[in-house]
Amino acid sequence: MDMELSGRLKKLPPYLFADLRRVEAEARARGVKVIRIAIGDPDNPTPDPVVEELCRAVRDPADANRHRYGCDVPVEQFPQAVRNFCKRRYGVTLREDQVVTTSGSKDAIAQFALAVLNPGDLAIAPSPGYPTYNIGHVFAGAVTYQVPLLRSNGFLVDFDAIPLEVRRLAKVLWLNYPNNPTTAVADLDFFRRAVEFGRRNNILICHDNAYGENTYDGYQAPSILQVEGADEVAVEFFSLSKAFNMTGWRVGFLAGNASAVRGLRAVKDNSDNGTLRAIQFAAAKALDSYERIVPPINAVYQKRRDLVIDALNASGWNLEKPKATIYVWAPVPGKYRGSSAAFAADLLERTGVIVTPGLGYGQWGEGFFRISLTYPDDVLTEAMNRIVKTKG
């Protein structure tokens, strides 16, 4: 039987990264020697202290619950480590009811829409932006208003440019700084304006802080929760994936507004069974060891960032070095007339290099492409050698 899928799935565009994997498979089948530098999935292993804690916890004979549902017997050490981390890193004090453990950011973002949005509600998401914001809205039956992130404004949301009718109707506004895909960063004054915007318009500010710890040249990214009163109108999504090389582990947390946190916890109670206890113990170890673990990881990305930026600039791109994230965001060469899809397709056919076309992040991502730094130096070097040949 050919089952007809739900209408909500039919409303979704092809998922960007699934589409990239399909394109790669098709190219390899044609005999193309592919170099993929498109997806942000760390190539280096999870740090030893975290792995060792996982192994200890999963084998611990004293823990009779170690293989049981993570939701029924949660690890108290992880939310405590979260609160300690937020206090040490940001100076933010969180109550127990302001934190919930998640299976990474992606799951949490999609589930969160079910917690706070009703069919027909309006939600604001950035363009370009992480596709899962809009995907969550579709699952909840909500409608997305895309607010443009413009190069002329440093890829920051312009709150004043959001129409009054949108402000009146919207229930949530998504922010993401350091930003994927643009690599833009925001200062604490920007977050103060965001909190005031949320308070004035009765809009929940949802800040995706997935890249807040991937920073370079001494830069430290702020948290929206550092703003006085932010926990009244904002939540912040954290992930251990990129900061600790733990993408496959699927663990993170949501912090902030207690009622919104309670809403996500209710969705999770009814849709999943939590995170394996051993992973929670290991995640607590990661957060407790943040100061020792994260700097060496960032040093690798900073070196790769310099490698990529220097190579592109030597061939005429004129890019600034991003202060954060694990990406490089660049305009497509002029001969492609602003078409990121045309550039990405031609690059693959001519050189075998796969980058992410900016259009995949929304209409305002058009004209740009994204490179991920989660590939070995020699792979990035070879990819740059191939890319610069297309510049003319």
Where are these regions (language model features)?
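Conserved core segment of the aminotransferase class I/II
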Residues: 227-302, 306-315, 390-391
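A short helix->loop->beta-strand "cap" motif at the edges of active sites that frequently abuts
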Residues: 121, 142, 200-203, 231-232
